[in-house]
């Protein structure tokens, strides 16, 4: 099994983790803080020497590997159609973003600002979350089509929940960038799903 295949599977797990956490926050108003931190931290890794540096280690995206196994596995279990919709939508949105050099330049500048702010604030501070959310709202969401988030209205009305959801969508886009850079494609998911599941189960 090639290193590139392993890296691609890792990138796809990163997308799955962001989608899973979006769903969790939208439904329950909260999610595992460590997983949230790991996904958001990946946004700030803009010049990795190797793919694994984006997430730090495989344990950082364990929820993503678990979601990958559940979604692509052939054990007959009920699939999460909503999570699949988020993953497909994020990949499609990133493909559009990749063609917009003007937006990519602005994206780099805004992410650098957050990196500087992190010297003074914790990554999960509401101010940082709000700034990450605004990057998604200002630069990525308008490219369209907009990703419709389903969840509990009581939670979705709360500003902090909205910030977390949008910040996680930004993290999902970051993982999609890595997936594309590693030549990830829909056909690979279809034809290599069994190998991807076997690999994901190791983590």
Curated annotation (Swiss-Prot):
Note the InterPro entries from the entry: HflD (IPR007451), HflD-like_sf (IPR035932)
The annotated topology with respect to the bilayer is: Peripheral membrane protein
The Gene Ontology CC terms held by the record are: cytoplasm; plasma membrane
Gene3D superfamilies referenced in this protein's UniProt entry, alphabetically = HflD-like (1.10.3890.10)
Q: Which family does it belong to?
A: Belongs to the HflD family.
Name the chain's protein: High frequency lysogenization protein HflD homolog
The residues forming a coiled coil are: none
Q: Where is it located?
A: Cytoplasm; Cell inner membrane
Question: Pfam families, from UniProt?
Answer: DUF489
Gene that encodes it? hflD
Which keywords label this protein? Answer: Cell inner membrane, Cell membrane, Cytoplasm, Membrane
Top-level lineage group? Bacteria
Alphabetical list of PANTHER family matching this protein: HIGH FREQUENCY LYSOGENIZATION PROTEIN HFLD (PTHR38100:SF1)
């Amino acid at each position: 099994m090639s290193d590139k295949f392993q890296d691609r599977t890792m990138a796809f797990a990163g997308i799955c983790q962001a989608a899973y956490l979006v769903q969790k926050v939208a439904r329950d108003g909260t999610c595992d803080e460590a997983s949230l931190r790991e996904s958001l931290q990946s946004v700030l890794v803009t010049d990795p020497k190797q793919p694994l540096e984006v997430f730090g280690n495989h344990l950082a995206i364990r929820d993503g590997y678990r979601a990958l196994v559940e979604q692509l596995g052939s054990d007959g279990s009920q699939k999460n159609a909503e999570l699949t919709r988020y993953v497909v939508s994020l990949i499609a949105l990133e493909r559009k973003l990749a063609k917009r050099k003007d937006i990519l330049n602005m994206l780099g500048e805004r992410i650098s600002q957050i990196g500087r702010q992190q010297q003074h604030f914790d990554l999960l501070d509401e101010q940082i979350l709000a700034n990450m959310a605004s990057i998604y709202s200002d630069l990525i969401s308008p490219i369209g089509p907009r990703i419709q988030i389903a969840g509990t209205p009581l939670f979705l009305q709360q500003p902090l929940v909205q910030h977390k959801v949008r910040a996680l969508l930004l993290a999902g886009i970051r993982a999609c960038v890595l997936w594309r850079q590693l030549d990830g494609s829909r056909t690979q998911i279809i034809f290599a799903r069994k190998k991807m599941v076997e690999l994901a189960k190791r983590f």
